[in-house]
């Protein structure tokens, strides 16, 4: 059973303590009524993983844990088998005691694009919205963050996160809650909020931006990464039934239009930090994610377009501040 008690105890002693007025009841309701049919199978995989304290832990350059003495072939096989029970692995990669989890996304490449543009994360309390397996949270801790809290309602991601955490010596500097941002009160408590790969899935993107703002302290920093298209400040793509085979894509603005959206929501010091085309080297099928990936979603005759005929995925990073 995945236990959130450590997180409750942690925030009871800091500036997130007011969250305890609503959070335990939400989690209890989730545990009682909303668990996925495979959740017990996934959580069992976490439970059966060995308790290991890493001798060497690198979260600054990667997510890598090593033991002082190499694990036996049997120990490595046990870890690999249990981690494979948590497939598909989409966000990573992870290198854990000789088990190399080659995820669908090279999330380390995204982090390398984002990190140089951030305010110093040292000592910060961070919220990562739509955090997936939690890869970027570990990198935030590696960059000096005091606490990283991730929210993502996908329960497989929760189990992947808890599996990695266990293999990192039960590290308590990062926590994942199985919630969506609409379930959070206006905490106004985070120094930095990340929303990466979420905005285009929201039916109301401006409402999402307001929700992000409500989580920030005054002068806090928002890091927003999302799909964009080329165009001026009035350009927004509203895809039909699907975009790159995804049904739940609603609005894809230009970076300039997105800048205006942020301005409309009251953000200041808005910067377009990076714009990059997503390549089939960054998002691809692997042994740890064996179903379709980006190459299958692009036009086989024109990789500059999706199979539906829209511009191929391009992502922008915007960084801004709540006054």
Swiss-Prot record:
One of the protein's GO biological processes: tRNA wobble uridine modification
Keyword tRNA processing applies: yes
Top-level taxon of origin: Bacteria
Transferase as UniProt keyword: yes
Residues reported in the UniProt entry to bind carboxy-S-adenosyl-L-methionine: 91, 105, 110, 130, 152-154, 181-182, 196, 200, 315
Catalytic function, reaction form: carboxy-S-adenosyl-L-methionine + 5-hydroxyuridine(34) in tRNA = 5-carboxymethoxyuridine(34) in tRNA + S-adenosyl-L-homocysteine + H(+)
GO function terms (MF aspect): transferase activity, transferring alkyl or aryl (other than methyl) groups
Keywords of this entry: Transferase, tRNA processing
Record EC number: 2.5.1.-
Classification via CDD domains: AdoMet_MTases
PANTHER family hit by this protein: PUTATIVE (AFU_ORTHOLOGUE AFUA_2G14390)-RELATED, TRANS-ACONITATE 2-METHYLTRANSFERASE-RELATED
HAMAP family found in the cross-reference section: tRNA_carboxymethyltr_CmoB (MF_01590)
Quaternary assembly: Homotetramer.
Role: Catalyzes carboxymethyl transfer from carboxy-S-adenosyl-L-methionine (Cx-SAM) to 5-hydroxyuridine (ho5U) to form 5-carboxymethoxyuridine (cmo5U) at position 34 in tRNAs.
Assigned protein family: Belongs to the class I-like SAM-binding methyltransferase superfamily. CmoB family.
The protein, known as: tRNA U34 carboxymethyltransferase
Lineage, top ranks: Bacteria, Pseudomonadati, Pseudomonadota, Gammaproteobacteria, Enterobacterales
């Amino acid at each position: 059973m995945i236990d959130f008690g450590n997180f409750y105890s942690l925030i009871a002693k800091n500036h997130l303590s007011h969250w305890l007025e609503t959070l335990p009841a939400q989690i209890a309701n989730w545990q009682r009524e909303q668990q996925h049919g495979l959740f017990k199978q996934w959580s069992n995989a976490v439970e059966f993983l060995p308790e290991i304290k890493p001798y060497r832990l690198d979260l600054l350059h990667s997510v890598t844990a090593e033991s002082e003495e190499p694990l036996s072939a049997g120990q490595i096989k046990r870890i690999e088998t249990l981690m494979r029970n948590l497939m598909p692995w989409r966000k990573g990669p992870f290198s854990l005691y000789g088990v190399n989890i080659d995820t669908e996304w090279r999330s380390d490449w995204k982090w390398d694009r984002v990190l140089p543009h951030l305010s110093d994360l040292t000592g910060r309390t961070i919220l990562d919205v739509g955090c997936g397996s939690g890869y970027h949270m570990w990198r935030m801790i590696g960059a000096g963050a005091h606490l990283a809290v991730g929210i993502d309602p996908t329960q497989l991601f929760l189990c992947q996160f808890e599996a990695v955490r266990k293999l990192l010596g039960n590290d308590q500097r990062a926590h994942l809650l199985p919630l969506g941002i609409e379930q959070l009160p206006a905490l106004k408590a985070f120094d930095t909020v990340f929303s990466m790969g979420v905005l285009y899935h929201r039916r109301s993107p401006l409402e999402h931006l307001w929700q992000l703002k409500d989580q920030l302290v005054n002068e806090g920093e928002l890091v927003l990464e999302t799909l964009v298209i080329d165009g001026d400040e009035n350009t927004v793509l509203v895809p039909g039934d699907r975009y790159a085979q995804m049904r739940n894509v609603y609005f894809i603005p230009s970076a300039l239009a997105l800048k205006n959206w942020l301005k409309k929501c009251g953000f200041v010091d808005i910067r377009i930090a990076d714009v990059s085309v997503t390549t089939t080297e960054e998002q691809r099928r692997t042994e740890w994610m064996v179903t379709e990936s980006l190459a299958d979603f692009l036009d086989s005759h024109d990789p500059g377009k999706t199979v539906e005929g829209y511009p191929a995925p391009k992502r922008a990073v915007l960084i801004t501040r709540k006054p």
